[in-house]
């Protein structure tokens, strides 16, 4: 997760990768359409933008902005970006304003970059891969997982199980599917 760099610094672990952070936010607003379909658009910055039905509410977003820290919060600029984009793309009876925001969600995406000394700022931020990287130290039996997406967690888990086995930890049944199957 986003704290592996801090963990590695505290334990003295040297790795080939590190993180840069992309902050994403979503706003929860009253239901904006009677339909229960996810709406997708391209935002002004060219990335995908969503309106996701949530019972009597709609989750709208997201942003993709650089963050220096895994600790983040919604800024006025973030909020306005989301409101402006949804208002431009839907012909609502009344445009959404800050007063319509019921709740806000904010987090960072840990993006993996090489630890070669470059800070990742010279790369096209929106084109950076959301893939993961794994650094292992067999001498200390240390595994660091960088980047990745929740939707790929099963594959990452299988990969990590392989590294754990390589380090001499006997897995109870390597053929057993561990992700919710009986």
Model regions and ranges:
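C-terminal catalytic lobe of FAD-dependent flavoproteins
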Residues: 3-59, 65-182
């Amino acid at each position: 997760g986003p704290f592996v760099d801090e963990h590695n610094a505290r334990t003295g672990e040297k790795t080939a990768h590190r993180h840069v952070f992309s902050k994403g936010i979503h706003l929860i607003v009253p239901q904006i359409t009677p339909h229960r379909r996810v709406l997708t658009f391209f935002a002004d910055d060219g990335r995908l933008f969503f309106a996701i039905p949530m019972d009597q509410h709609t989750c709208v977003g997201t942003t993709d902005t650089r963050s220096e820290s895994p600790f983040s919060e919604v800024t006025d600029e973030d909020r306005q970006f989301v409101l402006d984009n949804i208002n431009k793309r839907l012909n609502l009876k009344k445009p959404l304003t800050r007063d319509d925001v019921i709740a806000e969600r904010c987090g960072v995406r840990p993006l993996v970059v090489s630890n070669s000394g470059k800070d990742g700022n010279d790369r096209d931020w929106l084109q950076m891969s959301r893939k993961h990287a794994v650094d292992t130290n067999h001498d200390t039996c240390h595994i660091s997982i960088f980047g990745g997406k929740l939707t790929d967690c099963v594959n990452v888990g299988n990969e990590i199980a392989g590294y754990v086995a390589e380090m001499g930890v006997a897995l109870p049944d390597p053929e057993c599917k561990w992700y919710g199957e009986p």
